[in-house]
Amino acid sequence: MMDLDNIPDTQTEAEELEEVVMWLIINSGQARSLAYAALKQAKQGDFAAAKAMMDQSRMALNEAHLVQTKLIEGDAGEGKMKVSLVLVHAQDHLMTSMLARELITELIELHEKLKA
């Protein structure tokens, strides 16, 4: 991972930032996919599998959130970081994944109550 204390000034550093942003997209997308897979398992009544998938989803989301935190710390609200479309896209992925996980957690709990 790149040193986020030094925001990119060169093409190589910009490419490194793009790699970090892609890592954010990949992890947040993985978190969302695992959450939806967990919901599918819950609908089928396999709550142990659903819990395991939600745990994996949480870990992927934690990885994505860590990357986001480092990006924010690197900028420190000073506007050092150039905002690109891919960075906005990454933030969108993260936020929708967080929301999906929260809602899917509630849906799984409802399925458990209905099956009880």
Label the model's feature ranges:
Residues M2-A116:
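Terminal alpha-helical segments
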